[in-house]
A protein has these predicted regions:
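A conserved mid-protein helix/loop that constitutes part of the nucleotide-sugar donor-binding site
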Residues: 13-21, 201, 208-224, 243-246, ...
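Active-site donor-binding acidic/aromatic loop of nucleotide-activated sugar
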Residues: 240-245, 258-267, 273, 323-324
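Short His-centered aromatic/hydrophobic patch
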Residues: 95-101, 119
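N-terminal strand-loop element at the rim of the active site
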Residues: 5-13, 23-73, 154-157, 239
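Conserved acidic donor-binding segment of nucleotide-sugar-dependent glycosyltransferases
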Residues: 317-319, 323-330, 339-345
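Acidic anion/phosphate-binding donor-loop and adjacent secondary structure
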Residues: 128, 156-160, 166-167, 174-193, ...
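Acidic donor-binding loop of glycosyltransferase active sites
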Residues: 91, 260, 275-289, 302-303
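Short hydrophobic beta-strand element within catalytic cores of glycosyltransferases
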Residues: 303-306, 316
């Protein structure tokens, strides 16, 4: 099966890392088209996955108005025509983001190729403007053969926004457990590299630096924890959120935490860094569609605390495979960090259970098989659920 993958971003976020894992299986019979250049192209090339950058970024943000969307049509139409021409060489179009859905839906009409939409977002007011919610739902309902949701939370939000339930199927992100378990051997070298003492309890936060990711909550929580508890913030600002980084650094300075908080920026050795931590925290203030870092931490054998909202609640069983904390509450977060700090044996045992759970439930091989079956059905029945709409 030949697949044309579409993604709007040149920067590797969660949706892009998921696409990387999927495309790797089809690398000898696929093409990944990006709407902007960046590190994601380099990452695809490093994995021998064919990639082509088609255009500069479309000028539509998650909260943009319909007028701004219309103004971008000068870019949209040429891009759609390029994709339509390319897609005639492939069996199906696989749109991995919302802007890719817009382009892919129009291109699929011209090329008569079935469209698959991989939904990595929660279509809610916290994440999208009402206009963009309507655009996504309308295009998916009308043109997609199937909507692959990355969690039950994403699927439920799609249906609540008007999406057809019969179109959607939930397929979680897949992971290669061996890649993360190998990182455990790097725990001591990494801790030595950063000068962590044996007594230091290191809390890791892994995501792009953005207000809704909640790094400021972890920084505030540290003020309620023992002085031997420190934090590393791994990730960089994307999408024009550099001001938030300065706010975080000022917060650290104002709270006299300069010696307890390290900003590491973007790192490619995330698994090694996770394995070096005593705890990984996920602090998103809005519901997370999935939460890859949660599963990655589990696979590394590192205990994890996650915000109790969205897809994260499907990944963590409180007190069994990790801990859930009320979003936006630094005091509750500090309480759980203290709990893990005071009970190392219990924390390690829970981390072991989580590692087993993640290895069994999110194995990339099994996820690949689920996706392959769905894509085969799309190729054999290209109209999918939409066959009843014609």
């Amino acid at each position: 099966m030949k697949i044309l993958f579409l993604d709007q971003s040149g920067k590797p976020g969660g949706a892009e890392l998921c696409l990387l894992d999927i495309a790797r299986k089809y690398r000898d019979r696929c093409l990944v088209c990006l709407f902007s250049d960046g590190d994601f192209r380099t990452l695809l090339e490093a994995n021998q996955i064919p990639v082509k950058v088609l255009a500069t970024p479309l000028g539509i943000s998650k909260d943009s108005s319909f007028l701004i969307g219309l103004l971008s049509t000068g870019q949209l139409i040429p891009l759609m025509l390029k994709v339509a021409r390319l897609s005639r060489q492939y069996d199906l179009i696989y749109a991995n983001t919302q802007k890719a859905l817009v382009v892919g839906a129009l291109a699929s009409v011209l090329s008569r190729r079935p469209l698959v939409y991989h939904l990595h977002d929660i279509l809610s007011p916290e994440h999208f403007s009402p206009t963009n919610q309507r655009i996504a739902v309308t295009l998916a309902n009308r043109f997609a053969a199937v909507v692959i949701a990355n969690s039950q939370a994403s699927q439920s939000a799609f249906i609540a926004a008007g999406g057809q339930a019969k179109l959607s199927q939930v397929v979680y992100n897949g992971f290669n457990p061996s890649l993360y378990q190998a990182a455990m051997s790097q725990r001591q070298p990494i801790r030595q590299e950063f000068g962590f003492t044996p007594q230091e309890f290191v809390v890791g936060h892994f995501s792009r630096l953005a207000p809704w990711k909640g790094q400021h909550l972890l920084i505030e929580a540290l003020t309620h924890c023992p002085r031997s508890v420190s934090a590393i913030l791994v990730g960089a600002a994307l999408f024009g959120e550099e001001d938030y980084v300065q706010q975080l650094k000022q917060q650290v300075k104002d709270l006299n935490l300069e010696h307890r908080v390290r900003f590491l920026g973007f790192r490619s050795d995330v698994a090694d860094l996770m394995a070096a931590c005593d705890l990984v925290v996920h602090t998103s203030t809005a519901p997370e569609p999935f939460g890859r870092v949660i599963i990655e931490a589990m696979l590394c054998g590192t205990p994890v605390v996650a915000a109790a909202a969205g897809g994260a609640m499907e990944l963590v069983e409180h007190g069994v495979t990790g801990w859930l904390v009320k979003p936006g509450d630094p005091l509750k977060l500090a309480t759980i960090i203290q709990h893990c700090y005071d009970r190392p044996n219990l924390t390690i045992e829970i981390a072991k259970q989580a590692q087993i759970h993640a290895s069994q439930s999110f194995d990339l091989g099994e996820i690949d098989r689920q996706l392959a079956q769905i894509l085969l059905q799309v190729r054999e029945h290209p109209n999918g659920a939409n066959s009843t709409n014609d």
